């Protein structure tokens, strides 16, 4: 208890944040982990299916005190678990103080945790990828760990952490397995949006708002998209291909649409990871990439660079042109979730999830946002998902299974959201109850609070982390009142 | 609101119970129902599987007031849903006062709701029978009904009812789908026991305690089992076959064991349905069958009837000897759950569930109970389940998935238990929190409170029903505070 008080005093007195590890951005001081594997049932809900797969999980127990250390559990989301280990420094900043055991299980069908290796993404094998199966994996693993480490509920409460879809999973774990997870920090978790309860134009409107904070930026972006539109209308795909230095020139409307999607994606990513320092989370980006991009665009055009070339220069902040040209078909892949498309296995799995349990229908209209009209609605999603994955979208399922807006009965969850994050309007922004607490980070982008402390952190994220620590301490103290039972 | 106050006044002033329907036992006044069917996904958790099946559900809307009537939802359990409609009169006693819509969905793989018809029980088809799939069926159906009837959360809160395994499901629905179910009456729901958290000798010890309330009964039962044991030791299966009037004589230790199980089962059933009036729920039995059986046993032996014949006479209270003999192989089938074995499809499904998610390992030792030693433990269960269903028992799953003893985060559940019910020690007998309320019925057997009001009801069940109504009103009033939103 005393150590927690010290921690809070430290935080409140200076609000300088925790400085146990600096320079998180280069992963230089990221703590080591042990890589372990556990056998999980492929199908937790069909007991006739005895097949198992190897789930990877990362563990650090160097600070763990079995007598009263909690378990810090990161709810692995849509990617290689090591990348989340390298981008969730907040947990390592506070784990030594809490003397916590740190566990990062990998989400099934991502990273190394592929039930059927590279053929996991075949239509007849992908069906075991679901939010429910994943949560069951986590519940079973955590129960196993409490046996292996001889943990008890009183001394070693489990706190879930997660960002984005991982934050959604952390919250859901508290909804569905409060017997196992004592509390959850759900950072940037757009739970309402993914349950299909947000307008489809919300996301890109908020991307636009981010860029609109920079003087003169949005009008130039609109001007650039207009210039593209004019060229396309005249069939001048050659001009566009040259101006944007495309490795593979476009020659028709479909190619033009792909160029627009690639361009729009640059704004999406910069808005999402608008961090106050250089970071390489969704691409190598400079500090405050939105400001950086806008200033460059304004400066370029002021210098007389034509608008299309200036626009290409903006894209090159995110995209590599190592071959002296841009491969827009490699750098952006059309998929079910227009905000997150990529190459490789992880992108395939995410695409399947965006067709099943995560509603991510976002579109632009050029009115409430600065982008060209690119329609995407439930009907188009349904067509795409049937064609690509052979699945009929079960539209109502997510809000039935994961409670939609009716989450009042849950307890011990922090929903944190940064106002720079275009996802923030998709989640709870005010307290739902005394123990469903909303934390707002005025100058924060996508789950900035989960990242390690940095000298450039704005005050608002330091305060957010303080509030989160306060809640975590509350959850741990709550556990102390219970007998020392197994989970 | 006023009508509820009237209801409570009525109940508290007289405590005579609700007399809207009498003579429930003969089903004479059981309200009518509409039989409806809905398409349900066979696999709610694998979106690649688009197969559906027809789930039956029964509806009565004759009293329903859409403006403020709740939905009374019975969580169908292991049998034909019509049999539960005919044995859950409490809901019909109060539904007119609450102006409730009454819905009884049938549990998948029971009654008519067989996904693959008669071949549903093949090893390659049974795997879609699970508690999780069943709960998803209910959640999806209830969401569909709110659309069909244009219900909203404020005006039409859904209250779940269930007895025994149905009570477990009602409670679980509130654990996992509190967005849909506002409160649950879980009658005689041994949630701890089925999660594997009770000693294997508990159940039959409580059966013994029931019979021990009748003077002179247990010593005679022990004497009778001893006499059987003596005959068996001498290999005198002929004597046993004659005394028990077996249609098919037994001739070896296996046959003898089956006779013992058949005999023990008579006690099990009589203890479970030790109701204050004749009932035909798990067999046609007289009022207070435990007392009836004991008095007959005592009288028979007092009259000089030999102990084995007296014992056979006791069994005949439950079992039919229409062919002038007892077919013990038809009247009792050995299975995974030694407390509930029978013939037919429903029994097959229950057997599978007892091998998967419902731990029902009960055994007798002749010390803490009055029965011969019949061992049954996890190891024997595992062997049986592997042999019969080809499933490896996942022993820890039920307490991981359904919270075991750690249910404190749930709200709005009444756990009612009758002290005559041998299952009562398997569930919560004291309040877990302000809104997880234990109701004890001193003179009640297995979910007597869910049955319709009867002139012979003991005072304790009338009080229990009053307490339950009080909670239901509380849940409905809670819903009134919310906006009129969809589920």
Q: What do the PLM-derived regions correspond to, one by one?
A:
Chain A
Residues 417-418, 422-427:
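Conserved alpha/beta-hydrolase "acid-adjacent" motif
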Residues 125-149:
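Alpha/beta-hydrolase active-site loop
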Residues 409, 415-417:
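Short beta-strand/loop motif that positions the catalytic acidic residue
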Residues 109-124, 449:
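Glycine-rich "HGGG/HGxG" loop immediately N-terminal to the catalytic nucleophile
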Residues 322, 329-398:
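Small-residue-rich helix-loop
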Residues 163, 169-351:
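Alpha/beta-hydrolase
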Residues 151-165:
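Alpha/beta-hydrolase fold nucleophile elbow
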Residues 2-101, 112, 121, 420, ...:
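Catalytic-loop region of hydrolases
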């Amino acid at each position: 208890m005393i150590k927690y008080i010290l921690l809070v005093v430290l935080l409140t007195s200076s609000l300088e944040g925790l400085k146990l590890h600096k320079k998180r951005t280069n992963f230089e001081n990221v703590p080591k982990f042990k890589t372990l594997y556990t056998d999980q049932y492929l199908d937790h809900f069909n007991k006739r299916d005895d097949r198992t797969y190897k789930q990877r999980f990362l563990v650090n127990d160097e600070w763990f005190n079995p007598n009263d250390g909690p378990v810090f559990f990161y709810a692995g989301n849509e990617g290689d678990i090591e990348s989340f280990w390298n981008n969730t420094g907040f947990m390592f900043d506070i784990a030594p103080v809490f003397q916590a055991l740190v566990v990062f299980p990998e989400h099934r069908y991502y990273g190394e945790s592929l039930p059927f290796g590279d053929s996991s993404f075949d239509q007849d094998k992908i069906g075991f990828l679901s939010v429910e199966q994943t949560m069951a994996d986590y519940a079973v693993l955590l129960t196993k760990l409490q046996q292996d480490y001889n943990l008890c509920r009183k001394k070693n409460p489990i706190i879930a952490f997660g960002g984005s879809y991982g934050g959604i999973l952390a919250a859901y774990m508290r909804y569905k397995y409060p017997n196992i997870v004592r509390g959850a920090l759900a950072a940037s978790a757009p739970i309402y949006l993914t349950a299909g309860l947000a307008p489809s134009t919300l996301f890109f409107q908020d991307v636009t708002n981010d860029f609109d904070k920079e003087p003169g930026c949005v009008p130039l972006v609109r001007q650039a998209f207009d210039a593209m539109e004019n060229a396309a209308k005249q069939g001048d795909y050659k001009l566009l291909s040259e101006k944007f230095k495309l490795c593979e020139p476009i020659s028709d409307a479909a190619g033009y649409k792909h160029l627009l999607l690639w361009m729009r994606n640059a704004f999406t990513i910069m808005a999402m990871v608008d961090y106050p320092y250089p970071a390489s989370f969704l691409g190598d980006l400079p500090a405050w990439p939105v400001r950086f991009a806008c200033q460059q665009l304004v400066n370029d055009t002021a210098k007389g660079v034509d608008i299309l070339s200036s626009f290409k220069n903006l894209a090159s902040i995110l995209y590599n042109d190592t071959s002296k040209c841009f491969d827009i078909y490699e750098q952006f892949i059309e998929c079910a979730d227009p905000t997150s498309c990529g190459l490789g296995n992880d992108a395939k799995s995410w695409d399947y999830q965006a067709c099943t349990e995560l509603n991510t229908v976002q579109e632009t209209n050029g009115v409430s946002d600065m982008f060209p009209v690119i329609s995407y609605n439930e009907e188009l999603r349904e067509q795409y998902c049937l064609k690509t994955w052979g699945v009929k979208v079960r539209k109502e399922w997510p809000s039935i299974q994961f409670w939609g807006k009716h989450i009042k009965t849950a307890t011990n969850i922090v929903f944190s959201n940064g106002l720079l994050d275009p996802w923030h309007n998709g989640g709870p922004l005010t307290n739902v109850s005394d123990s469903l607490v909303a934390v707002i980070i005025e100058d924060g982008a996508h789950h900035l609070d989960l990242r390690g402390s940095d000298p450039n952190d704005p005050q608002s994220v330091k305060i957010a982390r303080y509030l989160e620590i306060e809640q975590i301490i509350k959850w741990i103290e709550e556990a102390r009142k219970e007998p020392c039972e197994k989970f």
